[in-house]
Structure formats: structure tokens, C-alpha cells
Amino acid sequence: MTVSTAIARLNAADPDFARHLDHLLSWESVSDDAVNQRVLDIIKAVRERGDAALVEFTQRFDGVDAKSIDDLILDRARLELALTRITPVQREALEKAANRVRIYHERQKQDSWQYTEADGTVLGQKVTPLDRAGLYVPGGKASYPSSVLMNAIPAKVAGVTEVVMVVPTPRGEVNELVLAAACIAGVDRVFTVGGAQAVAALAYGTESVPQVDKIVGPGNIYVATAKRHVFGQVGIDMIAGPSEILVVCDGQTDPDWIAMDLFSQAEHDEDAQAILVSPDAAFLDRVAASIDKLMPTMERADIIEKSINGRGALIQVRDMQQAMDVANRIAPEHLELSVADPQAWLPHIRHAGAIFMGRHTSEALGDYCAGPNHVLPTSGTARFSSPLGVYDFQKRSSIIFCSEQGASELGHTASVLARGESLTAHARSAEYRILTQEKGN
């Protein structure tokens, strides 16, 4: 049995290709006035009423019979219990994935440094981890334990003192895999709250929920809107759009493999985007046939079909160099280089969240256990953004120590520049430190 999908076909030789591509890529999630106002009301309530507001919203939105905030707190012992409630195979997979993620992120750690100039002046940079990070995890059956690993482990590697996780438990439904992942990743505290109210609690603190320095993790439109509103009070990772995959293929990979790689992102939601670029028109036809053949075998076929038909595309290009140009124009979240010699083409890629090299490297491996982070820039923001990493949980302070001679010498320069800006106090502050014998020079 096969189905007939209506995936878009584009050709880079078409005079209107750029316009068609822009239309394909266009996606904007704008919170409407009602969502914005509701989120602002929730934030205000949490700031004013703290724990009581959290309990009330959790009862209302999640259907949880919580009498007090104590009913919404999971201690470390509960996380350890979750490890015993998952299968040995699941635990082994989580621990292996966590170990690989940890090893990779250890290489990202930045260290402080200093250097000393001839006159004894010392300049440098001090790298310090954040004190506390907040991790938002979606709840219910759609929970992703892999996201817990990807968000929490870099924070712990960075040296963050405390990682606080919030995860809703709709109708009391607890995902043991998520709690087990939190235990393995080193999460310190868990609160079973979600939505905008959880974001507000992390940003401003309540009697029980500690205020954090940065909030990371995905969520629905209410969570994303709340993160926008609290940014500045705390740091945030990003406002993520729908998941994306762009596959560049020379036409020599099994078309079933490519179709399934496209499905792997399309199954996330109807707005996800899956695009294949190839110079081989016949190969595009074979992949289209594989899509139709494999679609009925998918558990989430309805979602995949809507995604493929609504935002997917098969794009024919002149050659592999033009394929690179198209890839850089799209700046995808996930980029597969399913080609014979991916290393040869890697220097041509400037904009991508993660690059999967070669025919055997499916994007799914990066999602779960390869090691690099799966929290990636979407919606073209890979042009200026990077994957989540240890550096997102570290901050840098400049170090300046001037010797007497150094302060005297730099004082002349600072004085000239400060007076040029009519900032007399700046100038005089520097001038006071000029050595007496140099003041007349």
C-alpha cells in the first residue's frame, strides 16, 4: 500500500526560485494579544502570590490535585527511584548517551587566562559558571528525556552550582524516563509545574522555587511567550521554531534512508520542515516514491504527511556547489551531507546548526547519543547562533591590573580620549595616577 503525497518540487534554475524558496521557508510564530495578555497575567500573579499562584495554576491547567507546593516538589530520592522503574535496557541507553554528551561537552569548557605586559600591567579574562540554571521540560507522554540530558549536562560540566528542573505532570502523569534522565544528568531539584507559571517562578523566584540566572529548554507558545517576557530579568537559551532538516545528497544514497531521515523531523509536528536538495532529478523521483511507500508504515503518518505536504520540498540544483549555496541560504537546524566525500564539502558550509557527515550519519543519532547538543538554532538563525553548549552556562569578566608605571603611561592616552568626549571626571581620574615626573611631558 502506498499514498500519494503532495510534496513541493522546486528547481533552482527557475527564475522565480528565490521567491518560491523564501515562501517555503517563511514561518512566524507570533503570540496573539490574547496569549500575550494571559502570559502577562500569569507572570504578575506568580510575582505577587508566589507558591500559592503556582499551586492554583497547576490545579487549573494540569488537573493536579495539589494541596500545597510540597505536593509539587520531587526530591533527589524520587529521581533515584525512577532509575529503578525503567527497564535495564532503557537505563543503559540513558547512561551511555549521557556519558557521550558529557565527554563531548567537556571539550567546550573555557578557562580563565591572563598575560603580563612589560611594565607589570596584567590583563586577562575570568571565566565563571552561572550560580543557578533553570531547565524547562515539557510534560506528559510527549516528554523527551534526551532533552533533559542535552540541557542539564552542559550546565553541570560548566560548573553551575544548582540545576533546577520544572516539568508539568498533566493529570498526575509522571514520565519515569524523564525523571531518570534528570537523575543521571545531575539535576538538583525538580518542581512538577509547567507553562508560563513555571517560567515566571524560575525568573523571579517564589518562597520555594529559587530564582535562576538562565532558563533553557523547549515549550509551547505560552512557555515561549513567557521566556520572551522574562528575558532581561534572566537569560534564556533561544526561542525555538519548528524542527528542520535539510538533506544534501549526490543521488547515491538509498532513497528509503533519505525518506526516513526526512520523516524523522516531520514527525515532530505539522510545522516541522524537511527538505532534500540534489542535482539528480531521477533520484528526487525515487525519494518521492519512497516517501509514498513508507508513509503508511509510520505511527505518526498524519503529522508527517501534513508536515511534508505543507512545508517539505524536493529541490533540484545544477550541481553540488549550488547545493551548498542553497544550504547556506536556508541555514538549517540539521544538515545532512549524504555524499561520497563529506569532508570535501564541509568547508563550503557556513550556516547550519549541526552538520551530519556521510551516508551513515543519520540526524537521529545526533538527537540522542552521538554527543553534540541537539538544542540547535532554527528558522535561519544558524546564520548568527550556535548550538547550546557549556559556554551558555559560563560568563566572562575582564581583568585589568595596572602597575604604577602602566597606570601612568595609559593615563596620558585615557586623558586625551576622555577630554575629547568632554568627560572631565574620567580624564582627571586617569590624570591623578600619572607619575609626577611624567605630567609635564
Swiss-Prot record:
Pathway recorded for this protein: Amino-acid biosynthesis; L-histidine biosynthesis; L-histidine from 5-phospho-alpha-D-ribose 1-diphosphate: step 9/9
Keywords: Amino-acid biosynthesis, Histidine biosynthesis, Metal-binding, NAD, Oxidoreductase, Zinc
Nucleus keyword on record: no
Single GO cellular component term: cytosol
Its EC number(s): 1.1.1.23
Keyword Magnesium among UniProt keywords: no
Residues involved in substrate binding: S243, Q265, H268, H334, D367, E421, H426
EC class name: oxidoreductase
Binding site for NAD(+): Y136, Q197, N220
The protein's required cofactors: Zn(2+)
Catalyzed chemical reaction(s): L-histidinol + 2 NAD(+) + H2O = L-histidine + 2 NADH + 3 H(+)
Active-site residues from the entry: E333, H334
Residues bound to Zn(2+): Q265, H268, D367, H426
Cofactor: binding details: Binds 1 zinc ion per subunit.
Summary of the function given for this chain in its UniProt record: Catalyzes the sequential NAD-dependent oxidations of L-histidinol to L-histidinaldehyde and then to L-histidine.
Family: Belongs to the histidinol dehydrogenase family.
HAMAP family, per database record: HisD (MF_01024)
Record protein name field: Histidinol dehydrogenase
Gene: hisD
